Amino acid sequence: MSAVRKVNEESLAEAASVIAGGGLVVIPTDTVYGVACDPRNEAAIDRIYQVKSRPRFKALQVLLAFVDQLDGLGLDLPSPLNRLAAQFLPGAFSPIAVAREDCTLATVSATPQGRRTQGIRVPNSALTLRISVSYTHLRAHETGAYL
């Protein structure tokens, strides 16, 4: 199904349902439109790569509603990124977090040295916040690139 919706409570619930069901939605952020899905759903992640014809070596970012979600996702921001994040997020800043062993995101990448990392974004957009909060199990995932 493909449809353009105005943002209201009904469309937010619909987007959350699509994401929870493993589907994709296109959402606005403070900088670009992104393709969103559940970042724990490997099939949905695969679909983003397929739809965008994006090579698998290009990592995906996770869109968060709040910086304090990092710990619950099994992610840590090393110093000095934690201080920069406190100063510049929400906003157009995308730090790379370190994924702990308890991180279950399907979007985690490994460096050549084997360190597991994950790019994050906390957009400065009330609309994006409403969309990401509507999916309460886990915030939406976005690629940060045009579809």
Q: Where is each model-derived feature located?
A:
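Active-site-adjacent structural elements in enzyme catalytic cores
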Residues: 1-145
